[in-house]
Swiss-Prot record:
S-S bridge residues: C126-C220, C197-C212
Name this protein carries in UniProt: Proteoglycan 3
Superkingdom per UniProt: Eukaryota
Expression sites (tissue/organ): Expressed in bone marrow, spleen, and thymus. Not detected in heart, liver or lung.
Signal peptide stretch: 1-17
Taxonomic placement: Eukaryota, Metazoa, Chordata, Craniata, Vertebrata
Keyword Signal set for record: yes
Length: 222
């Protein structure tokens, strides 16, 4: 009677030991599997962060290229006009045509300079040589006067003092700071035009946007 009982206890002990050993063998495998899963999750997280960072960088590059035109057109306008090109000669008299705007207005003096310059250089010439600015236009009659004068001396397009400024809220401004209260845009302008500076075309007298780096004759008011 005792012998079968002893055998039963021995058998039960062997089974328990087998289960413990099996659990001990399986546990490292489970730990290794969990470790691999954790490593994979961390790697996926790093890849996702890198992808997001790359997309952000690409977006910034695209945005930067879209605004490059504005920087190129406006960066020089931030400088002090009187401090630049002081040693440059003013236009020769034979390259200019003086005229008066409103009859009897002593302060309404204008000069058309036939020497082509960029918008920025033209503004600096107006400031330094004539103590004025690129001309602002506030009426059809004066616009027509400029148109006729430029056409008579064979100038097809000239700078006037208008420039597009701003980022999200863009607006046209005159270089002399006067109110923008008149416009004579060509069909489709200014919305479909490129560039940030304003020209007057003598054929029709309409205004068009152009790159501020273009070299054109210009009109100063002083």
């Amino acid at each position: 009677m005792k012998q079968p009982l002893i055998l039963s206890f021995l058998l039960l002990g062997m089974v328990s030991a087998f289960h413990l050993e099996t659990a001990h063998l399986e546990n490292p495998k489970r730990e290794e599997s969990l470790k691999q899963e954790a490593d994979g999750s961390r790697e996926q997280g790093r890849e996702l962060a890198l992808t997001q960072e790359t997309k952000q960088t690409e977006g910034e590059e695209v945005e930067g290229s879209q605004h490059q035109d504005i920087f190129e057109d406006e960066e020089a306008m931030e400088s002090d006009p009187d401090a630049l090109n002081k040693d440059s000669a003013c236009p020769k008299e034979e390259d200019t045509t003086h005229f008066q705007g409103t009859p009897g207005c002593k302060s309404c003096n204008y000069v058309l300079v036939r020497t082509p310059e960029t918008f920025d250089k033209a503004q600096r010439v107006c400031r330094r040589c004539y103590r004025g600015n690129l001309a602002s236009v506030h009426s059809y009659s004066f616009n027509y006067q400029i148109q006729n004068l430029a056409r008579k001396i064979n100038q097809s397009i000239v700078w006037i003092g208008g420039i597009l400024r701003g980022w999200f809220w863009k607006k046209f401004c005159w270089m002399d700071g006067s109110c923008w209260d008149f416009g004579y845009w060509a069909p489709g302008q200014p919305g479909s035009g490129g560039g940030h500076c304003v020209t007057l075309c003598t054929k029709g007298g309409h205004w068009r946007r152009a790159s501020c780096k273009s070299h054109l004759p210009f009109i100063c008011s002083f």
